[in-house]
Amino acid sequence: MISIVVPIYKSEFNIPDLITQLNSVVDYYSEEVEVVFVIDGSPDRSFDLLQSKDIIKKFKSQLILLSRNFGALSAVQTGLFNARGRVIVVKAADCQEPVILLTNLVDEIVNDRADISIGVRETREDNVKTRIFSAIYWAIFRRLGNDDVPRRGVDIFALSKTVRDQIIVIDDNPAALVGLLYWVGFRRVEIGYDRIERKIGKSSWSFRKKAKYAIDSLTSFSGAPLVWLAVLGVVSAVISVALSVTVMFWQLIWHQSPPGYTPIVLGIGVLMSSMMFGFAVLGAYVWRIAEDTRGRPSSIIAARLELDSNMSQS
């Protein structure tokens, strides 16, 4: 069996095209395909539409309704934990990945050429602000976390059941998922593709969500910011000692305090700002530790439905 995990949030108007795309994938394979739809607290009619018998589905499906919006990565993690296939694909509901990419990702694993296959964007059609944020974030993540991660990030991937089982055992924060794909090892392959322009709606991946994801993923996978803080502390200490020695000699030789009240105040301001930044970084790590030790689930399932193919209605 092949499983396709699709997180759903405000995707009501994308569902007809999504089902058509998934039906095309089913047509490509002779073995059974299941689709795991994880409705991430979506406020629209997505859950009802996916149950509708008016839309012809050539595949079995699981409909997992979460109790609220936990975030796309939490929904993906829930889908991975519940998928039953020997190969599991994770894709978005916006249909911006070509069907041939899905089949290529699966074929790499089915034909035993890889354990993890990752779709890598060759181009980005996003707005300027999104492209800039993405470029900065992934550059930082590659620098601090893992430089094997693609420059444009990861949106779609497939993995074998063996890899999925290892990710379940790790049970890390959902924000660490992309990093885990490159941390767990195994045979990995990347497949380039040109992303299709979004036809309907707009991304719900807001700046606030991106910022939270950036902080969570970096604190889950890198201790480099703490090293930077240590370096900053050493540099600040050296500067402070140098200034103290300068003031002391100035008073011993000229018997007066050195001029320059403004530079001193500015220096204090810079040091205080550095300290506040350091406290913020430490706080982010402490919060990540606190979140992980609480043992709360990454999501809560409110309802689950098992649906068979309704091909007979066509």
Question: Where are the predicted features?
Answer:
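Structured catalytic core of nucleotide-sugar glycosyltransferases
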Residues: 1-126
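Residues in soluble alpha-helical coiled-coils and helical-bundle/repeat scaffolds
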Residues: 9-13, 96, 100, 168, ...
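Residue-level signature of catalytic and energy-coupling elements of molecular machines
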Residues: 22, 79, 94, 117, ...
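Solvent-exposed polar/charged
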Residues: 55, 81, 107, 134, ...
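Acceptor/aglycone-binding surface of glycosyltransferases and processive sugar-polymer synthases
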Residues: 66-68, 72-82, 99-175, 197-215
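Hydrophobic helical membrane-anchoring modules
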Residues: 176-314
